[in-house]
């Protein structure tokens, strides 16, 4: 007998905006989505701000979205947690941070603060860097150096200069700190083993090699002059009198203030991992602190904020009922449907199968907007025909990853490719008498231009996301309004005929 699978399809970066201008979601020809939208119950969910455990007004992101969906409750994000501790003062007694600074003071070595310089709040926040500078000042440190990774992706593409000026003003006001290097996140924050990029960022920080400039402002202005926006700033060493302001040396303390792990792992391994094989380099022996736990297998680092653990996430609970589940995505979003969806747990649940489809190797995804959506779909259809799975979690990366390029025509093509796949998947699920829920983790592709400047917009948005209930049982029924991402899991469990565990504080969205 065929199983009646319950599937959640996450259209990554597919938000809802009433504004049609620069809206790739509205501009795309998506007959399958429209057909399902018109026939089946649907509502909108909040995917940003307080509803997902972020500060008010803060745009959502993929990690936060998948954590909230998988947990079935609002998960207070590291961003909110750390900001709160800075305000309350407990940040300044954090054991790992204090220890790194005390060691630098005792050994008369340097303190290096590295991370993404913006207020994007996806990977880092400039306020956390300011908090570290204040702590360094309190500790009486003088040799404090910032290695700034330029953003231009979670914030406007050329906003980096403003963040450099803001940082320089803060350092002047606090009375400590100098910028030693700047690197675009394309180099310093790769997550696809493109070691030739990471090596350039490493060489700037550890060897003082790379582009040269006499100030960070000069470096970024030159980059703009060369038509390279923040994300793509070549790793640049700031010099004084022909010598690097600072480089990371043995015995120094290093604090990496990014709180999101996925794009922090590679450069961290390059600096500290004795088994590192990405490129030839001399291993540094430093006191290294990760703001959060980037990787359990990294044993040679301290962690300032260890993960909070969550029991009875959707995957764990479904597994405890003896049911089979599948997680499927291409490389760019594989960690999201596995690690993040499971509440930051790497280990698969019992009877949880995983299918990883390789993302295409292209410089930027506007060059291949369909990415690997067709391959993901083929694999998924094969798996559905095995009649093995009770629950399937699927992610299509395209609207987000192509949305990040700022190229609207490509984002439209990305959504059209996904719509084609969505149609095939929906037909197959309905053929199996299953249920398909369609949603997104946050917005992106529905706003491809910055309305204030008319320039391309590459960042996420705070827009709501769709939630569709596609099933023979759903016809003629309705969903509640006013929901959030944390309400998806309780809704899915209800459809699966399972009791919602008490840890899930989200609400079932089915109107009785």
From Swiss-Prot:
Q: What is its EC number?
A: 5.4.2.12
Matches recorded under Gene3D superfamilies: Alkaline Phosphatase, subunit A, BPG-independent phosphoglycerate mutase, domain B
The entry's cellular-component GO terms read: cytosol
Which pathway is it part of?
Carbohydrate degradation; glycolysis; pyruvate from D-glyceraldehyde 3-phosphate: step 3/5
Q: What are the positions of the active site?
A: 62 (phosphoserine intermediate)
The protein's required cofactor(s) are namely: Mn(2+)
Q: What does the entry's cofactor note say about binding and number?
A: Binds 2 manganese ions per subunit.
Q: Which residues bind Mn(2+) 2?
A: 12, 62, 441-442
Principal EC category: isomerase
Which GO-annotated molecular functions does the record name?
A: manganese ion binding; phosphoglycerate mutase activity
Task: State the reactions this protein catalyses.
Answer: (2R)-2-phosphoglycerate = (2R)-3-phosphoglycerate
Q: What does this protein do?
A: Catalyzes the interconversion of 2-phosphoglycerate and 3-phosphoglycerate.
Give the protein family: Belongs to the BPG-independent phosphoglycerate mutase family.
**Name of this chain's protein:** 2,3-bisphosphoglycerate-independent phosphoglycerate mutase
The gene coding this protein: gpmI
């Amino acid at each position: 007998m065929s199983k009646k699978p319950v599937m959640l399809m996450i259209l990554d970066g597919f938000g809802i905006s009433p504004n049609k201008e620069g809206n790739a979601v509205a501009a795309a020809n998506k007959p399958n989505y429209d057909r399902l939208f018109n026939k089946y119950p649907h509502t909108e969910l909040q995917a940003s701000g307080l509803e997902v455990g972020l500060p008010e007004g803060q745009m959502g992101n993929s990690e936060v979205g998948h954590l909230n969906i998988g947990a079935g409750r609002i998960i207070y994000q590291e961003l909110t947690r750390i900001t709160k501790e800075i305000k309350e003062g407990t940040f300044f007694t954090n054991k790992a941070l204090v220890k790194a600074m005390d060691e630098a003071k005792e050994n008369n070595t340097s303190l290096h603060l590295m991370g993404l310089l913006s207020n994007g709040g996806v990977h880092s926040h400039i306020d956390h860097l300011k908090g570290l500078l204040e702590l360094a000042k309190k500790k009486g440190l003088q040799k404090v150096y910032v290695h700034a990774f330029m953003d231009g992706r979670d914030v406007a593409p050329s906003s980096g200069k403003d963040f450099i000026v803001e940082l320089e003003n803060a350092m002047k006001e606090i009375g400590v700190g100098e910028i030693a290097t700047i690197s675009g996140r394309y180099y310093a924050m790769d997550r696809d083993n493109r070691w030739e990029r990471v090596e350039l960022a490493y060489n700037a920080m550890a060897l003082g090699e790379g582009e040269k400039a006499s100030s960070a402002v000069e470096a970024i202005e030159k980059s703009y002059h060369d038509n390279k926006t923040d994300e793509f700033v070549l790793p640049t060493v700031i010099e004084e009198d022909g010598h690097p302001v600072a480089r990371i040396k043995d015995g120094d303390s290093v604090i990496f203030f990014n709180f999101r792990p996925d794009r922090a792992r590679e450069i961290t391994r390059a600096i500290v991992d004795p088994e590192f094989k990405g490129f030839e380099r001399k291993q540094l022996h430093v006191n290294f602190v990760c703001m959060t736990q980037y990787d359990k297998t990294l044993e040679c680092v301290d962690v300032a904020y260890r993960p909070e653990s969550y029991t009875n996430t959707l995957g764990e609970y479904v597994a405890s009922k003896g049911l089979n589940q599948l997680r499927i995505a291409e490389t760019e979003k594989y960690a999201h449907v596995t690690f993040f969806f499971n509440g930051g747990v790497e280990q698969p649940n019992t009877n949880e199968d995983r299918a990883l489809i390789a993302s295409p190797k292209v410089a930027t995804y506007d060059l291949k907007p369909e990415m690997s959506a067709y391959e993901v779909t083929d694999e998924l259809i094969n798996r559905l025909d095995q009649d093995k799975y009770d629950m399937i979690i699927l992610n299509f990366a395209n609207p987000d990853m192509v949305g990040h390029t700022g190229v609207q025509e490509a984002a439209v093509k990305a959504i059209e490719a996904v719509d084609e796949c969505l149609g095939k998947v929906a037909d197959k699920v309905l053929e199996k008498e299953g249920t398909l829920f369609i949603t997104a983790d946050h917005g992106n592709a529905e706003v491809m231009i910055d309305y204030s400047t008319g320039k391309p917009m590459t960042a996420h948005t705070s827009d709501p996301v769709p939630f569709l209930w596609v099933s023979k049982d759903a016809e003629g029924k309705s969903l509640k309004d006013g929901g959030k991402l944390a309400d998806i899991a309780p809704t899915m469990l209800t459809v699966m005929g399972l009791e919602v565990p008490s840890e899930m504080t989200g609400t079932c969205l089915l109107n009785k």
